[in-house]
Amino acid sequence: MNYLKLTFDKLEVGEINDLVAHESCGAISLFVGTTRDNFDGKTVVLLEYEAYEAMALKTMNQICEELRARWPDIKHIGIHHRLGTVPVKEASVVIAVSSPHRKSSLEAVHFAIDELKKSVPVWKKEQYADGEGCSEWKENKECSWSKSHRDNHIL
């Protein structure tokens, strides 16, 4: 089963872990991406996320299909991404994968976050502390439609 969600609510890691748990699985691997308090010497106070929601969910489902093709023993996959305001230390994305053994779930989670960063249409804006400059929308250099990606790859 795939558990995909875009939400403005706080992400609960334990809840997502419970969604993917299964009695036939001896492994659940998790990736939790959180808001850090700094970037390029500036103090970050929060991130704001926006998404093209229908396309984001479709792309997340395609990632799940790819995970299942590469690691057929995977049981459940959870990908939850937060939208709106995400303060420092809170989770913006949680990816959870269950499988009978750890190798598949660990590799799948690593692949999933890389693919999510490359292909899912979610954008973030950093809000800085007072006096440290304006907030700014961040380009995801891994994203296939970014200028940085195009400059470094032959299309």
Curated annotation (Swiss-Prot):
Key words, A-Z: Cytoplasm, Molybdenum cofactor biosynthesis, Transferase
Question: Which residues are listed for substrate binding in this entry?
Answer: H101, R102, K117, K124, K125, E126
Among Pfam families, the record links this protein to: MoaE
One of the entry's Gene Ontology molecular-function terms is: molybdopterin synthase activity
Which pathway does it take part in? Cofactor biosynthesis; molybdopterin biosynthesis
Classify the main location.
cytoplasm
- Which reaction equation describes what this protein catalyses? 2 [molybdopterin-synthase sulfur-carrier protein]-C-terminal-Gly-aminoethanethioate + cyclic pyranopterin phosphate + H2O = molybdopterin + 2 [molybdopterin-synthase sulfur-carrier protein]-C-terminal Gly-Gly + 2 H(+)
Question: Which GO CC annotations does the UniProt entry carry?
Answer: molybdopterin synthase complex
Taxonomic superkingdom: Eukaryota
Choose any GO biological process term that the UniProt entry carries and state it.
Mo-molybdopterin cofactor biosynthetic process
Q: Which CDD domains match?
A: MoaE
> EC number(s) on record?
2.8.1.12
The kind of enzyme this is, by top-level EC class, is: transferase
Q: Where in the cell is it found?
A: Cytoplasm
Stated family:
Belongs to the MoaE family. MOCS2B subfamily.
PANTHER family tied to this protein: MOLYBDOPTERIN SYNTHASE RELATED (PTHR23404)
Described function:
Catalytic subunit of the molybdopterin synthase complex, a complex that catalyzes the conversion of precursor Z into molybdopterin. Acts by mediating the incorporation of 2 sulfur atoms from thiocarboxylated MOCS2A into precursor Z to generate a dithiolene group.
**Known partners and oligomeric status:** Heterotetramer; composed of 2 small (MOCS2A) and 2 large (MOCS2B) subunits.
Q: Extra notes? A: This protein is produced by a bicistronic gene which also produces the large subunit (MOCS2A).
User: What is the protein's name according to its record?
Assistant: Molybdopterin synthase catalytic subunit 1
Q: Which organism is it from?
A: Aedes aegypti
What lineage does the source organism belong to?
A: Eukaryota, Metazoa, Ecdysozoa, Arthropoda, Hexapoda
